[in-house]
Swiss-Prot record:
Also able to use Co(2+). Induction: By glyoxylate and allantoin under anaerobic conditions. Monomer. Mn(2+) binds at E196, H198, H202, Q236. Belongs to the UGHY family. This is (S)-ureidoglycine aminohydrolase. It comes from Escherichia coli (strain K12). Substrate binds at E196, Q236, Y249, K253. One of its GO terms (molecular function) is manganese ion binding. Keywords: Cytoplasm, Hydrolase, Manganese, Metal-binding, Purine metabolism. The keyword Cytoplasm applies. Residues 184-230 form the Cupin type-2 domain. It is found in: Cytoplasm. The gene is allE. It catalyses: (S)-2-ureidoglycine + H2O = (S)-ureidoglycolate + NH4(+). The lineage of its organism: Bacteria, Pseudomonadati, Pseudomonadota, Gammaproteobacteria, Enterobacterales.
Length: 261
């Protein structure tokens, strides 16, 4: 069901969907229900807007399929807005601050506030990317900078000392950065050490495998292609399940800032 699965038009079965939306708390968005959004600057792309302030998030996530020569040459970002791009599949060419980046699967680009990024598909076949934007929260004496690389080059961290849960950190742990992007991977049977409750929000896109996720104390099956929004203080934890393939997702997290009152 849905454009990502190429099942649209006349139905041959009951209308059904695994999606769950609890505004400000959590949401599970599945490929079956996602629709295309027309966004100025995105040409020859299928773009879906995921988390937004309308859902209760302080950020915006996108899932974008770039067809041949598709991309955004107008510029993604803006004054006071930080952005992040991750290549799920394919090859793209991205530009920012006068530099050009050839990004393949696992490639990423972070642009600090005020720096626009452009990108275009670099192959005849479709490429798919995960995009993020958020209004930057400044702190006196510190500033972020442009960061690019590939997930394959990042240090593999044993999450909380567990050999079967691997964490990748995309951005420096510096006070200039008010957010980070990570990949968390669970071997089948592995899990978080405890159910978390914290002020940070997450937007998570599942890259591989299957899992069972606790969202506000509801245990919910999830799998590759699903998207999860977790609001501040929403209970959260997950298990990897299935046979062989790791349960992995890329996710954002706000950090390094006090709470304004």
């Amino acid at each position: 069901m849905g454009y990502l699965n190429n099942v649209t038009g006349y139905r041959e079965d009951l209308l059904a969907n695994r999606a769950i939306v609890k505004h400000g708390n959590f949401a599970l968005l599945t490929p079956d229900g996602l629709v295309k959004n027309i966004i100025p600057g995105f040409e020859n792309c299928d773009a879906t807007i995921l988390s937004t302030p309308k859902l209760g998030a302080s950020f915006v996530d996108y899932l974008v399929t770039l067809h041949q020569n598709g991309g955004n040459q107008q510029g993604f970002g803006g004054e006071g807005i930080e952005t992040f791009l991750y290549v799920i599949s394919g090859n793209i060419t991205a530009k920012a601050e006068g530099k050009t980046f050839a990004l393949s699967e696992g490639g990423y680009l972070y642009c600090p506030p005020g720096s626009l990024m452009t990108f275009v598909n670099a192959q005849a076949e479709d490429s798919q990317i995960f995009l993020y934007k958020r209004r930057y929260v400044p702190v006196e004496g510190y500033a972020p900078w442009l960061v690019s690389g590939n997930a394959s080059e990042l240090e593999r961290i044993h999450y909380e000392g567990m050999d079967d849960v691997i964490l990748l950190d995309f951005l420096p742990k510096e006070l200039g950065f008010d957010m980070n992007m990570h990949i968390l991977s669970f071997a089948p049977g592995a899990s978080h050490g405890y159910i978390e409750t914290h002020v940070q929000e997450h937007g998570a896109y599942i890259l591989s495998g299957q899992g069972v996720y606790n969202l506000d104390n509801n245990w919910i099956p999830v799998k590759k292609g699903d998207y999860i929004f977790m609001g501040a203080y929403s209970l959260q934890a997950g298990y990897g399940v299935g046979r062989g393939e790791a349960f992995s997702y890329i996710y954002s997290k706000d950090c390094n800032r006090d709470v304004e009152i």
